[in-house]
Amino acid sequence: MHIILDNGHGLNTPGKRSPDGTLIEAIYTRQLVKDLALELEKHSHTVHILVPEPEDIPLNVRVKRINAICRAKGVENTVLISIHLNAAGDGTKWMNATGWSCYTCKGQTESDLLADCLYKAAIKHFPVGIAIGIVCSDAPVWEVFYCSFIEAVCK
């Protein structure tokens, strides 16, 4: 299995940080992607880090990179996971945000199966009520139209 990991926004993306600037999405998600890549490789998956650069890369460039990998490795063998941080409030003060979410393409797709696995794993590995938030077995999978989802050929 080829897994493309997209690490969200870049260092130069306005607003993608905590109110006091101590938590910067680009730094945090890039570390998450590196850690996840190591774990996936331990399980014999081939990992492609979509954006190794520190700066933000436009969506159309990301889509071209995604499609190149999908064409080379096979659409049926490739999964895209884009990691972002969610926020609460208007960015001017710290809030007490918790939890996480999973977004998939509109309609019933193979990405829904992965989302279901993520929710089940969260329930198994994270006790209800800890700082990461509360997850339940009927947690919603958010379906959206994102440029990278619409124009990418991978699943």
Q: What annotation goes with each model-predicted range?
A:
Residues L11-S18, G99-S101:
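A short small-residue
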